[in-house]
């Protein structure tokens, strides 16, 4: 009996403890009902990952911080990929392999078209509450793929030649307002010194800036269906570039730039390069006086024509930074909300790095103020405004990325003296024709 009594007592104690624990657990749940909305929001918070090519410190981090503060239920994380061949491969691999990518920036139309064909970019026509054409203007159409928007262009693409104004003044040269590659070489010869190159072009743009403006009008394919990449304007442009590298030697050869990983922006801002064919993205370093101190003023000139008679010349520009939504994203609606906000002014923190919003509803005066910042006295503002206010005819490269790669391969063989100009043109035309036959 004694043993039985002890067992009963122990059982009662256990039941009592369990009951108390259960009661406390229920009370805790009930009492935290209101707090649960704040202490357990993670169940309702949507997390988006935004991939872009701009360094976080150059504006993107401030952008997502501003968004996240105002939108606690939709939190965005920025992932930077370098906008070069390896960086774009990294993004494409992430898209195809199902890594966390909800929104991604495209910097050339051929790369966007490639991502559309792979099923990575969402057709934005399903969203009807935002008129891309109305907001961005007629230039937006250049980013349409098969007459549909798979990405929203968000900034004005502005390409021009950065010039050392002090060096120009010393040489008695005016800031050009309309010039040719022959003029560029003349300027480069006058500005070249033992410690300073005269002129350079970003390797990434070396095969498209010079002559694609004309081919965009003439067409990359002739009426008979064969390649037009052998047009006379192409040969002339290649010859001019080659001569500046190897004959007058006013430009660093492509091989030198790539083998030494020459930082052309640093070369220009360090007074080791007098003229740089680039674009608005250089502002993010030009305004960085800590890492790139300089004691000279910068002026701006339009991109050079190949010849003065080039009546069909178009300027590389239009709109850029086309943001797309991953077709496999689980949060397409939330990503779209972010895109609209970003385009209409959310992206302004990047204006200090040269990215001017394209949307008519973004504050353009604020963008220019941010662009110049505290460095206004370091620029020839008159020449900059001439570039910004010029309503020049522009184009976007529409060649498939594979053909662009073919051209670059063949052009580089010419630039490094491993094949003649005639062989280069013949090879490009043949490979382009072969590509079209495969397609």
Task: Report residues per predicted region.
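Hinge/lid segment of periplasmic solute-binding proteins
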Residues: 107-158, 212, 297-301
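Short, solvent-exposed loop/beta-turn-alpha elements that line the ligand-binding surface or hinge
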Residues: 40, 123-135, 177, 217-237, ...
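Extracytoplasmic "Venus flytrap"/periplasmic binding protein-like
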Residues: 66-136, 170-172, 267, 271-275, ...
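Long, aromatic- and glycine/proline-rich binding clefts that accommodate carbohydrate-like moieties
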Residues: 142, 352-409, 413
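Extracytoplasmic/periplasmic substrate-recognition and gating elements
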Residues: 69, 75-77, 171, 243, ...
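Short, low-complexity disordered leader/linker segments with a strong preference
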Residues: 1-48, 69, 426, 430-439
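Helix-loop-helix "hinge/cap" segment bordering the ligand-binding cleft or interdomain interface
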Residues: 69, 75-76, 144-207, 218-256, ...
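A structural signal for short loop-to-beta-strand junctions that line the ligand-binding cleft
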Residues: 92-93, 101-102, 131-167, 195-198, ...
